[in-house]
UniProtKB/Swiss-Prot annotation:
<dbReference type="GO" id="GO:0006289">
    <property type="term" value="P:nucleotide-excision repair"/>
</dbReference>
<keyword id="KW-0267">Excision nuclease</keyword>
<keyword id="KW-0228">DNA excision</keyword>
<comment type="similarity">
    <text>Belongs to the UvrC family.</text>
</comment>
<dbReference type="InterPro" id="IPR000305">
    <property type="entry name" value="GIY-YIG_endonuc"/>
</dbReference>
<dbReference type="GO" id="GO:0009432">
    <property type="term" value="P:SOS response"/>
</dbReference>
<comment type="subunit">
    <text>Interacts with UvrB in an incision complex.</text>
</comment>
<dbReference type="InterPro" id="IPR010994">
    <property type="entry name" value="RuvA_2-like"/>
</dbReference>
<comment type="function">
    <text>The UvrABC repair system catalyzes the recognition and processing of DNA lesions. UvrC both incises the 5' and 3' sides of the lesion. The N-terminal half is responsible for the 3' incision and the C-terminal half is responsible for the 5' incision.</text>
</comment>
<dbReference type="InterPro" id="IPR050066">
    <property type="entry name" value="UvrABC_protein_C"/>
</dbReference>
<dbReference type="Pfam" id="PF08459">
    <property type="entry name" value="UvrC_RNaseH_dom"/>
</dbReference>
<dbReference type="InterPro" id="IPR036876">
    <property type="entry name" value="UVR_dom_sf"/>
</dbReference>
<dbReference type="GO" id="GO:0009380">
    <property type="term" value="C:excinuclease repair complex"/>
</dbReference>
<dbReference type="InterPro" id="IPR038476">
    <property type="entry name" value="UvrC_RNase_H_dom_sf"/>
</dbReference>
<dbReference type="Pfam" id="PF12826">
    <property type="entry name" value="HHH_2"/>
</dbReference>
<dbReference type="GO" id="GO:0003677">
    <property type="term" value="F:DNA binding"/>
</dbReference>
<feature type="domain" description="UVR">
    <location>
        <begin position="206"/>
        <end position="241"/>
    </location>
</feature>
C-alpha cells in the first residue's frame, strides 16, 4: 500500500458516511456505507479478520485511491450509497437489472371506472393510485392481468378511448366488460368489482371467497340467475388460484424471505414474496464478482430492491445487514409504515429462511448451467463460421426502407449471448438517394466502424442481415477505413472485427437443398431432404412446407455455410438477426408516423414546429387529435383556447384530409414495372400502416427458384 493510501486510512473520521474505492485508473470499483467510516474501512485491512483475506488481497492489487463522503446520519448514508451505486455502477457492487425491467400493475382509483395498467416500476408513484408487484416476468403479469380482467370484468381501454367511444367493443359482446364507456353502469357496482380484484391481487382470497359465496347465494335467492352464474365463475377462478398457491405460514402475514447462496465470488440472492401467508412470487437475482462480505452485499441489495418495490411488514434475512436499523428506517419511510428486518434463529420463520436458501442454491445451479450452454453456443458459432475466436460481442445490422423513402439502419448488440440494449443504435441514411440497399449498408457500417475506432473498441463479430452483396458492401466499408477483418499473423493482439452475412430461409419451388416437413397418409410427420421430395411423394408423403435453409456467407468463400437445423448456433444467430429486423422496422414506423403527422399539421395556420412536437407527444396519432375536443387540445403544452380551436376546426371542416385508421387494411403496395422505384413523400403518407409494414416484413410470399 502506498503512502498516500496509508495516510488516508489514518485520517478516516469516526462518523457515518460512504466510501468509494477506486482502481489505479481512477475508476470507482466499490461503494460502501458505514456508521463509522474509520472502523469499517480499516477492517478490510485488519490481518486479524481471516474470513476476508481473499478480497483484501484483491484490494491490495487493485486499490489506487480512496474517497469518503461524511453524512449527517446513518440513514442518510444508506440513501447516498444507493445513489452512488446507480451513478458509478461499480464493478464489485450488486447491480440489479435496469429498473425499467421491473413491471407493476397500477390502479388509478381517482377515476370513477378505473382500470389496471402495466407500468414500469421506476415511474413516479401517483397519489390516489394503487400499485401491485413487481412481477418477475412479462408473462406472469400478462397472465395475472388476463385472469383479473376476465373474471372481474374491469375495462381495458385507455382513458382517451373511454371518453370518446360511441359503441361498445367486442369485450362487451363476449361478457368480459360491462362497457361503462357507452352504457350507464352504476359506479357502486363497478367499484365492487374493483374491490374484488384488489383483494385478489393482494392475496386476500379467503375473504373474497366468503363474500362471493354470500353474493352468489343472494343472487340465486333473488332469482337473478345470470348474476349468480357470473359470481359462480368468479368463485371458481379464485378457488383454482388458491389451489396453485402453497400456504407457508398460518398467520396470514405479508413478508419477504431472503435467501443467499455463494460459491466463490458468484452468488444468488433469492426473494420469496409471501402475501397473506401464501407464496405469491419467487425471484432469483444472480451477481458476479462479489468479493465483499455478505452483510454488505445484502444491505446494498435490500436498499436497491425496495426502491421501486413496496416493502412488506417483515423482511426475513439470513444475517444482519450492515446498518440494519438505518436501513429499516429508510424502508419504513419509503413505504409510509413500519418495516422490520428480522433474523430468526429457530421456529417456522427460520424454516422459511432455509427454504429461501435452498431456492437460492437451486437458482445458482440453474444460472451456471445456463452459462455453460451459452458458452457452448458461442463456441459452436466460432466453429461453424470458422471464426478466430468465440464471438462474445456480436452486432447485427439491417436496413429498412419503403421503396427508397425514409431509409433507416439498425444495429443491435449481444454480449455473452444476451441482448446488450445499451449499445443498440439507430441510423438515418443521409447520403444515399433511391433504392440502393448496398450503398445504404455501406454508409451505416462506415459510421459504426468510425465510431468504434474513435472509442478504441471493436466487436468480435458483425452479422449483416443479407446475402453476399450486403456482406461485400460491409467489407468494403471496413476496408475503406482500414479496419482489419482477420487477425494479424504478426500481431495477434491487434484489434480486428470479423463480418458474415446471414440470409433468411425462403420458400422454394421444387427440389432444392434444405429440408421439408412432410406428412404421411396416417399423419406421421418427418424431415425429408428436398432433393428426395419426388420420391417422398411417390411413397405417399405430401410436402407440408418447403423452405431453403438459413445460409451464412463468409468473406472469400463462394458457397455459403448451411447451419444445422435446430442447432444452438443457428438459434443464436437468428435471434440476433430477427432483433435487428424488429428494431429497424420499429424505427421506420416511428419516422413514418412523425412525417405523416408533421405533413398534415403544416396546413394549420399558426402551428409551429414546437407545437407540432407537443401534439405528437401528447396524442401520438392524428386520429386521436381529430377525436379530441378543443378543451383536451388546450391542455397540451403551448396551446391556448385559440390554437386549440384552430386545430379542432381544421380536422372538422368539410374538406378535412382523410386520416387512416389504425386497423390494418389492404395488401403490400408494389411499384409498377417490376423493380421498386423510390416512393415520394406523398406516396408514403398515402400508404396504410399495414401496407408498408407488410412490405418491410418481407414475408417471403414468392417462392425462390429451385437450385
Amino acid at each position: 500500500m502506498d503512502a498516500n493510501l496509508r495516510r488516508k486510512l489514518d485520517e478516516l473520521p469516526a462518523e457515518p458516511g460512504c466510501y468509494l474505492m477506486k482502481d489505479r485508473a481512477g475508476e470507482v470499483v466499490y461503494v460502501g456505507k458505514a456508521s463509522s467510516l474509520r472502523s469499517r474501512v480499516r477492517s478490510y485491512f485488519d490481518p486479524g479478520r481471516g474470513d476476508q483475506r481473499a478480497f483484501v488481497a484483491l484490494l491490495d492489487e487493485l486499490l489506487g485511491d480512496l474517497e469518503v463522503i461524511v453524512t449527517r446520519s446513518e440513514k442518510e448514508a444508506v440513501l447516498l450509497e444507493n445513489e452512488l451505486i446507480k451513478k458509478h455502477r461499480p464493478r464489485f457492487n450488486v447491480r440489479l437489472r435496469d429498473d425499467k425491467d421491473f413491471i407493476v400493475l397500477k390502479l388509478d382509483e381517482r377515476h370513477p371506472y378505473p382500470r389496471l395498467e402495466v407500468r414500469r416500476a421506476r415511474e413516479k408513484r401517483q397519489p390516489g393510485a394503487r400499485y401491485f408487484g413487481p412481477y418477475s416476468s412479462a408473462s406472469s403479469i400478462r397472465e395475472t392481468l388476463r385472469m383479473v380482467n376476465r373474471h372481474f370484468q374491469l375495462r381495458t381501454c385507455s382513458d382517451h378511448v373511454f371518453d370518446h367511444r360511441k359503441r361498445p367493443c367486442i369485450l362487451y359482446q363476449i361478457h368480459r366488460c360491462p362497457a361503462p364507456c357507452v352504457y350507464e353502469v352504476a359506479a357502486e357496482e363497478y367499484r365492487q368489482s374493483v374491490e374484488d380484484a384488489v383483494e385478489f391481487l393482494e392475496g386476500r382470497e379467503g375473504e373474497l371467497v366468503e363474500r362471493l359465496r354470500g353474493r352468489m347465494a343472494g343472487a340465486a335467492e333473488g332469482l337473478r340467475f345470470e348474476e349468480a352464474a357470473r359470481l359462480r365463475d368468479q368463485l371458481q377462478a379464485v378457488e383454482r388460484s388458491l389451489e396453485k398457491q402453497r400456504v407457508l405460514m398460518s398467520d396470514r402475514g405479508d413478508r419477504d424471505v431472503i435467501g443467499l447462496y455463494r460459491e466463490g465470488p458468484d452468488l444468488v440472492v433469492q426473494v420469496l414474496s409471501m402475501r397473506a401467508g401464501k407464496l405469491q412470487d419467487a425471484q432469483a437475482h444472480p451477481f458476479r464478482e462479489q468479493e465483499f462480505p455478505d452483510e454488505e452485499i445484502l444491505s446494498s441489495f435490500l436498499s436497491l430492491y425496495y426502491e421501486h418495490t413496496d416493502a412488506p411488514d417483515e423482511i426475513l434475512v439470513p444475517l444482519e445487514p450492515v446498518q440494519a436499523e438505518a436501513l429499516a428506517d429508510v424502508l419504513s419511510e419509503r413505504r409510509g409504515r413500519r418495516v422490520r428486518l428480522l433474523t430468526p434463529q429457530r421456529g417456522a420463520k427460520a424454516d422459511l429462511l432455509d427454504v429461501a436458501r435452498r431456492n437460492a442454491e437451486q437458482g445458482f445451479r440453474a444460472w451456471h448451467e445456463h452459462d455453460e450452454r451459452r458458452e457452448q453456443a458461442l463456441a459452436a458459432v466460432a466453429r461453424a463460421l470458422h471464426l478466430a475466436r468465440p464471438p462474445r460481442w456480436m452486432e447485427c445490422y439491417d436496413i429498412s426502407t419503403f421503396q427508397g423513402a425514409l431509409a433507416v439502419g439498425s444495429g443491435v448488440s449481444m454480449k455473452d449471448g444476451e441482448p446488450d440494449k445499451a449499445n443498440y443504435r439507430r441510423y438515418k441514411v443521409k447520403a444515399v438517394a433511391g433504392q440502393d440497399d448496398f450503398a445504404m449498408l455501406h454508409e451505416v457500417i462506415t459510421r459504426r466502424l468510425r465510431r468504434a475506432l474513435g472509442e478504441g473498441q471493436l466487436p468480435d463479430l458483425i452479422v449483416i442481415d443479407g446475402g453476399k452483396g450486403q456482406l461485400n458492401a460491409a467489407l468494403a466499408a471496413a476496408k475503406d477505413l482500414g479496419v482489419p477483418t482477420r487477425p494479424s499473423p504478426g500481431n495477434p493482439d491487434a484489434p480486428f472485427v470479423e463480418l458474415v452475412g446471414l440470409a433468411k430461409s425462403r420458400l422454394v419451388d421444387g427440389p432444392s437443398l434444405g429440408t421439408a416437413r412432410v406428412v404421411g397418409r396416417r399423419g406421421r410427420r418427418a424431415e425429408a431432404r428436398l432433393a428426395d421430395a419426388a420420391e417422398a411423394a411417390e411413397k405417399g408423403f405430401v410436402s407440408e412446407l418447403a423452405r431453403s435453409p438459413e445460409r451464412v456467407f463468409l468473406p472469400g468463400r463462394k458457397d455459403p455455410v448451411v447451419l444445422r437445423q435446430n442447432s444452438a448456433e443457428l438459434f443464436l444467430l437468428a435471434r440476433l438477426r430477427d432483433e435487428a429486423h424488429r428494431f429497424a422496422i420499429t424505427f421506420h414506423r416511428k419516422l413514418r408516423r412523425e412525417r405523416n403527422f408533421q405533413s398534415v399539421l403544416e396546413e394549420i395556420p399558426g402551428i409551429g414546429e414546437g407545437r407540432k412536437r407537443a401534439l405528437l407527444r401528447h396524442f401520438g396519432a392524428l386520429r386521436r387529435v381529430r377525436e379530441a375536443t378543443p378543451e383536451e387540445i388546450a391542455q397540451v403544452e403551448g396551446f391556448g383556447p385559440r390554437q386549440a380551436a384552430a386545430v379542432h376546426a381544421f380536422f372538422h371542416r368539410p374538406d378535412a384530409p382523410p386520416i387512416a385508421a389504425d386497423e390494418p387494411s389492404g395488401a403490400p403496395a408494389g411499384a409498377p414495372g417490376g423493380g421498386p422505384a423510390e416512393a415520394s413523400p406523398e406516396a408514403v403518407a398515402a400508404a396504410t400502416e399495414a401496407e408498408i409494414d407488410a412490405a418491410l416484413a418481407d414475408e417471403d410470399a414468392s417462392p425462390e427458384p429451385a437450385a
